[in-house]
From Swiss-Prot:
GO biological process: collagen and cuticulin-based cuticle development; cuticle development involved in collagen and cuticulin-based cuticle molting cycle; skin epidermis development
Positions on the Extracellular side per record topology: 42-62, 115-223
InterPro entries, alphabetized: Tetraspanin/Peripherin, Tetraspanin_EC2_sf
Subunit structure: Interacts with doxa-1 and bli-3.
Species this protein is from: Caenorhabditis elegans
Domain of life where this protein originates: Eukaryota
Expression by tissue: Expressed in the body wall (hyp7 hypodermal syncitium), pharynx and vulva. Expressed in a punctate pattern along the thick region of the hypodermis.
Protein's recorded name: Tetraspanin-15
Bilayer topology annotation: Multi-pass membrane protein
SUPFAM superfamilies, A to Z: Tetraspanin
Chief location bin: membrane
Cellular component terms per the entry's GO annotation: oxidoreductase complex; plasma membrane
Length: 258
């Protein structure tokens, strides 16, 4: 009875096996949520990467997706190994879970570091101002042009911040290199229902502005800070969730007699 109690078939072994399965399933569900959020981040926020370079937040999104997929595959292999009582594979999968947890923690730290850099050190407003004036609309910087158009359309904003509002477009190379009749602001600044008036005379003082009057710096910064906060803590929490089944897996592998 003592030998049986210390084996995978005893009460302790069955409890550890059950604990592993439950915690692994919880971890899989959490990994699926990480994958969904990472895909959303890459699909809906990666278009602004050209304005924020280095775009570490995109890397965090990739880490969320790729490492979470590896985590799920690892659990599936471990499920098979546990039910077949393949001791070596169970141990390997448990160790792999720890490695995956470390990679997720690294991803979370990258995200938190990005937030700190964006808040205190990265002159995002100056980067945006430079890209608007010098790079928007140039043939070899289509990524910048697309990023600005997506930003202004999606956030319903125009210009950078403060005095560098919609009027700043008249100082840009995009404006200077146009042929007459010139557009004063890009169409991405225009309210869709006012597109014609926005093209012809957007700065008419006798009518409400046909363009977005909010500037883009603060909305973009606040959005990226929020998105990265969620992504970073998803990474770290997923890493913590990985630890419990990895410990249970290592313990269970010691009870397998094969």
């Amino acid at each position: 009875m003592g030998a049986l109690g210390d084996s995978a078939y005893g009460a302790r072994g069955r409890l550890i096996k059950f604990s592993y399965i439950v915690t692994a399933l919880i971890s899989i569900l959490f990994s699926i949520s990480c994958i969904c959020y990472g895909i959303w981040l890459l699909a809906r926020r990666s278009q602004y990467a050209e304005l924020v370079s280095p775009s570490l937040y995109v890397d965090v999104g990739r880490i969320l997706v790729i490492i979470s997929i590896l985590s799920i595959l690892n659990y599936l292999i471990c499920f098979y190994a546990i039910f077949k009582e393949m001791r070596c594979f169970v141990t390997s999968c448990a160790v792999a879970s720890i490695v995956i947890a470390v990679m997720l923690i690294i991803g979370g730290c990258i995200g938190l570091n990005f937030r700190d850099q964006l808040t205190h050190y990265t002159p995002l407003n100056l980067k945006m101002l430079t890209s608007l004036r010098e790079l928007y609309g140039t043939h070899d910087m289509k990524g910048i042009t697309e990023s600005w158009d997506a930003l202004q359309s999606n956030f319903k904003c125009c210009g950078v911040n403060g005095t560098d509002n919609a009027q700043i477009w008249k100082t840009s190379k995009w404006y200077m290199h146009q042929r007459a009749p010139k557009l004063l602001i890009p169409e991405s600044c225009c309210i869709p229902s006012e597109i014609e008036r926005c093209r012809s005379n957007p700065f008419d003082q006798d009518a409400p502005p046909p363009y977005y009057t909010s500037t883009c710096y603060e909305p973009l910064q606040n959005d990226l800070l929020h998105v990265m906060n969620v992504a970073s803590w998803l990474c770290i929490t997923n890493a913590i969730v990985q630890i419990i089944p990895s410990v249970a897996g290592c313990w269970y592998s010691k009870l397998i007699r094969k």
